[in-house]
Amino acid sequence: MSHLAVIPARGGSTRLKHKNITPLLGKPLIRWITNAVLESSCFDKVIISTDDDQIFDAVADLNVERHIRPEHHATVTATVLDAMMDLMDEVETYNTFSYFLPTCPFISPDDILKGMEKLEQRQCDTVISMTQIPETVQLACLMSEDNVLPVFDNLEWGITNSKFIKKYYKPSGAFYMGLWNFLKENKNFFAGKTKGVIIPPTRSVDINTIADIKYAESIIW
């Protein structure tokens, strides 16, 4: 099977200026995920999709190619999914398509290999990196001025012991993988059979602020 990886990184980040090239322990943020993708040795081609020359310059010495991200896909309101689906129309066809976000620097080559193995064995249509939600979701309630309404039935049944409460997960944001033809047809990573690769909380850091950078550096050390 042939595999394409894309790392989308627009230049116009708002909360943290130049986020994708902000140093994390002296290394531009985008290099962390780029190195992991390359070290996995899974992909026939790795593309950096960016509208910013500085972002590509930060990884230009690595075995990557550049896709110039169109202006309409580089705005604050643009979605990564739309940008990736359009990019698939512009490049040659592969068997699988994956994209990785530079804001999640602690993904390992082994995480990527686990996801790709699921696709190659045709266990599913798509694979998404997942992490456990630390809060006990089943204790959630909706509140109004007049009432407190449990979201889940367990509170009505008096079940609050964590031993009897299910674990909930969410996308970690690090990567999305899928079979090429499936994505071309559905343009959605959740439309078919989806499997997850669980990323532990200590490696599920999503960097959007300086505080996130400092937290990430504290974890490394």
Question: What does each model-identified segment do?
Answer:
Residues 43, 92-94, 123-124:
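Short, high-confidence coil segments that cap the C-terminus of an alpha-helix
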Residues 10, 71, 131-132:
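Histidine-centered beta-alpha loop that forms part of the nucleotide-sugar donor binding/catalytic region
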Residues 82, 105-193, 198-199:
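Conserved core of the sugar-phosphate nucleotidyltransferase
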Residues 47, 53-98, 106-114:
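Short phosphate-binding loop-to-helix
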Residues 185-205, 210-214, 218-221:
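Catalytic donor-sugar/metal-binding loop of nucleotide-sugar-dependent glycosyltransferases
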Residues 42, 61-63, 144:
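Short, structured coil segments at secondary-structure junctions
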Residues 2-49:
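N-terminal glycine-rich phosphate-binding loop and ensuing alpha1 helix
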